Amino acid sequence: MLGYGGLTYTLHDSKPCLLIFAYLALKWRIIIGRKDHSHQRKCRLTVFSPFIFTPNGSLLLWSEVVDDIKRSSNFLGRPSPDHFSNHLAASVKQGLDVEVVCRQNNFV
């Protein structure tokens, strides 16, 4: 839920692109709704809004967020979770003396 003063937006979907779009919409309403700006400033924001928000809004609405862990595994200088799970499986194998029948990934 995003809110400011009397304005609140409740999101029923957990998609990040919708959250960003709702944040931009809320921010836009706050900028337009401020009473300390002159009438000229409000008109200027209204005139330039289609050029700024139309391309970005279309990207946010019709895009798909892809979380590729293997490509971004070195983002923080850490290996991906797949490597950790394989390492933990190897320690279980040594502790319980389990024989591997088949496996998909072969990490060393």
Curated annotation (Swiss-Prot):
<protein>
    <recommendedName>
        <fullName>Putative uncharacterized protein YDR327W</fullName>
    </recommendedName>
</protein>
